[in-house]
């Protein structure tokens, strides 16, 4: 069981699961390892399941994994899942053009542990603003489009497809996106319990190979992304409107990217410093405490027979 959320930052996971089943069915699989997708509604639920051992692997927020590892919870990041994919949305009829126009406004974020919040803080710092210059509201991402429509918030910062949902409906537009402002943005990372690493390294390696293969395949051509949308929209995975997922994949095509899954120490150090400044992590945590690079270093991207 591999846990994930119905967000496009997790799109490599449904592709990987279906690709492995296709390889087994075709008789081309190198091994019999199977990976079953388990959908969760929020990060706290995945966190609890990983901590309790109900699942052995899942996509998690990178700062949350850092914090868990620092608290001696036996988990390690073994791969990225994507890059970019967060947006700051405002109403189409609003006058906001510059980020600084949001001074004094109500802005929704998923949580203070979310990397979306760090993106927001990064944008604030560029304008010599602080979180005290806006009103921050924590809100589940699925509720954000309706809140913006009802004028309950002035803007929201979150991952896709919850920005695209409002944009496609016509009442919201993108003010800023990580694609333009934070190109190497990292949010969701593949996290595995240490006991699985110790007991079945080949299985973990196969999962990393599949995720890397899925990432390359997704970024290879638009037709592959169209196939991924059809897979992920199904009830066994995201159970979402395929038109909204398709919108994310096309507007623009690099709104979320998946091929570059390198784990670069300096990028994680930057993420940690931002988290410390935000108060969600209390002190620097050694890279090796929460990262196991061995699987990415040994990765051979799996063929995706879809």
Sequence positions of predicted segments:
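Pocket-lining segment of extracytoplasmic ligand-binding domains
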Residues: 63, 94, 137, 142-237
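Solvent-exposed, polar/charged alpha-helical surfaces in well-ordered, non-transmembrane soluble domains
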Residues: 11, 15, 48, 52, ...
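Secondary-structure end/capping motifs
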Residues: 198-283
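Short, flexible, mixed-charge acidic loops at enzyme active sites
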Residues: 18-20, 245, 287
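Short secondary-structure transition/capping segments
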Residues: 70-72, 89-90, 168-170, 187-189, ...
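Conserved C-terminal helix/tail region of periplasmic/extracytoplasmic solute-binding proteins
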Residues: 271-306
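Amphipathic, soluble alpha/beta structural segments
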Residues: 80-82, 87, 231, 243-245, ...
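Short, glycine-/small- and polar/acidic-enriched structural segments
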Residues: 1-130, 135-138, 154-161, 171-177, ...
């Amino acid at each position: 069981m591999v846990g994930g959320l119905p967000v496009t930052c997790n799109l490599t996971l449904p592709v990987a699961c279906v690709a492995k089943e296709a390889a087994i069915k075709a008789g081309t699989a190198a091994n019999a390892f199977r990976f079953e997708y388990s959908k969760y509604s929020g990060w706290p639920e995945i966190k609890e399941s990983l901590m309790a051992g109900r699942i052995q692997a899942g996509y998690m927020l990178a700062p949350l994994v850092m914090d868990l590892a620092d608290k001696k919870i036996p988990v390690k990041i073994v791969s990225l899942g994507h890059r970019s994919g967060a947006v700051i949305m405002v109403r189409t009829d609003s006058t906001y053009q510059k980020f600084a126009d949001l001074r004094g406004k109500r802005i929704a974020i998923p949580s203070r542990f979310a990397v979306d919040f760090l993106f927001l803080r990064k944008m604030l710092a560029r304008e010599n603003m602080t979180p005290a210059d806006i009103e921050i509201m924590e809100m589940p991402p699925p509720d954000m489009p309706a809140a913006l429509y009802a004028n309950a918030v002035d803007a929201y910062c979150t991952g896709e497809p919850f920005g695209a949902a409002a944009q496609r409906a016509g009442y919201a537009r993108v003010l800023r996106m990580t694609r333009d402002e934070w190109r190497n943005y990292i949010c969701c990372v593949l996290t595995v319990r240490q006991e699985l690493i110790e007991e079945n390294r080949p299985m973990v390696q196969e999962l990393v190979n599949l995720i890397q293969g899925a990432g390359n395949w997704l970024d290879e051509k638009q037709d592959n992304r169209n196939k991924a949308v059809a897979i992920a929209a199904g009830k066994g995975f995201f159970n979402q409107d395929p038109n909204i997922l398709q919108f994310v994949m096309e507007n623009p095509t690099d709104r979320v990217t998946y091929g570059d899954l390198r784990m670069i120490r300096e990028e994680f150090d930057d993420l940690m410093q931002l988290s410390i400044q935000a108060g969600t992590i209390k002190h620097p945590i050694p890279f090796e405490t929460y990262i196991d690079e061995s699987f990415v270093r040994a990765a051979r991207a799996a063929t995706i027979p879809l």
